[in-house]
Amino acid sequence: MKISREAYADMFGPTVGDKVRLADTELWIEVEKDFTTYGEEVKFGGGKVIRDGMGQSQLLAAEVVDTLITNALIIDHWGIVKADVGLKDGRIAAIGKAGNPDIQPDVNIAIGASTEVIAGEGMILTAGGIDTHIHFICPQQIEEALMSGVTTMIGGGTGPATGTNATTCTSGPWHMARMLQAADAFAMNIGFTGKGNASLPEPLIEQVKAGAIGLKLHEDWGSTPASIDNCLSVADEYDVQVAIHTDTLNESGFVETTLGAFKGRTIHTYHTEGAGGGHAPDIIKACGLANVLPSSTNPTRPFTRNTIDEHLDMLMVCHHLDPSIAEDVAFAESRIRRETIAAEDILHDLGAFSMISSDSQAMGRVGEVVTRTWQTADKMHKQRGPLPGDGPGNSNFRVKRYIAKYTINPAITHGISHEVGSVEVGKWADLVLWRPAFFGVKPTLILKGGAIAASLMGDANASIPTPQPVHYRPMFASFGGSRHATSLTFISQAALEAGVPEQLGLKKRIAVVKGCRNVQKTDLIHNDYLPDIEVDPQTYQVKADGVLLWCEPADVLPMAQRYFLF
């Protein structure tokens, strides 16, 4: 029996050789592999396959998956493939071919009476996003992030305090305890970073033992060589990550001074281009070091005609500057440079910048990490053409490079890749389903720990789920004890050994960060390029390995106004 590709795609989704456009970008992906057995596909519905004695077996709950996502197109750093995905006990149990093993061949995911089904036909499945630059200014950020497809938030803060408005620090054991207790209320994986600015180890050690999964050095607290050295020494001892916002004003040294203070030790450099803060004008040099794990924040993603003007106003507010003070204005203007922002676009495309995050409410938008990433990818595709590794007529390699920037690479950087960050067997089932036309803009379904935590949903009083008004709403995994069972709170090993979860009465599942101190940039997937960066101190022009990096700002972006008319 034969079926046309068009009819097959309509029924079961695209298969090997088919191409799919991502939203309204010019990025096309091509299916590399299909795990199905043609003619044995499983699909739920009236008159369909997943029925008793057909695609559904008689096996007990222990032998079948709890949830099956059928015929989904997976986009992850490791591939672009079509598969059934089985979830069990909150984790990804299998990727492959689902069905009834009693009557169907090559089944590695058994369906039974205890199996729920999510139809993935014609849908794209990705890992939940990981945002590693969160200012916890207001709790409403968390729902905003979740509805955008982010399922893990890492950063610091205590609410709308002046310190938190500027820095991602949950300062001290008392504040750490309050924030860990607050994290129980949310269907979101959360980890908090303490304040790393101290020249003696004891004030930092007590924060790690209180639950901090990392330490944040910020110039507003004084990112001096002494505090950098001390902070990295504590991190090495306790296996937690260090993130840094370096010294924009070059008060305690220049970029070479800071890089020297690292002493080859692993560090995550926030907004490494510099508009978000850091040695002016050449902090961007840091992305060429093997021990530096560089990220961007999303307001500079991608470079557009509005980027410069927007940043000046944002900076004055976020860093408590006064526009009537000439020195404050000069400080702001020194950070915002067309030349380095343009270079940042290209360095992302080359894989020299490895991660993208938000800088939530502190010069960044918490709900736009995913969108800004794909807008950058599309801009670079249009301006620079296919990457080496892309196939004929597809952008598969570029897509893998960019999705890694907000999934697996932040997970590796912060020691949580054993739990989250990819669509792989054994990982926590934090998954996002997208309609291709809305990919990267508006997800359809967000799963946390194998349960549906958020979704597009129509009128609750309607006779079917789809009537307007359709908007994002929290689902059952966002409520009661379900959120405790399906979301993670990350803490340090030292805090676990100190009994912090029991002392604070934490209800969410606890996971420990590990392997933070031996990560090198070469470990960051598809984003491990180590260029020799030069910045002209007069013109701010950037060269990588002797090649000038410049691109024009975009006048129009995809994934923008046409998606947000309602």
Curated annotation (Swiss-Prot):
Binding site for substrate: H218
Residues binding Ni(2+) 2: K216, H245, H271
GO molecular function, one term: nickel cation binding
Recorded GO CC terms: cytoplasm
Name by which UniProt lists this protein: Urease subunit alpha
Catalysed reactions, semicolon-separated: urea + 2 H2O + H(+) = hydrogencarbonate + 2 NH4(+)
UniProt GO BP: urea catabolic process
CDD domains: Urease_alpha
Keyword Cytoplasm on entry: yes
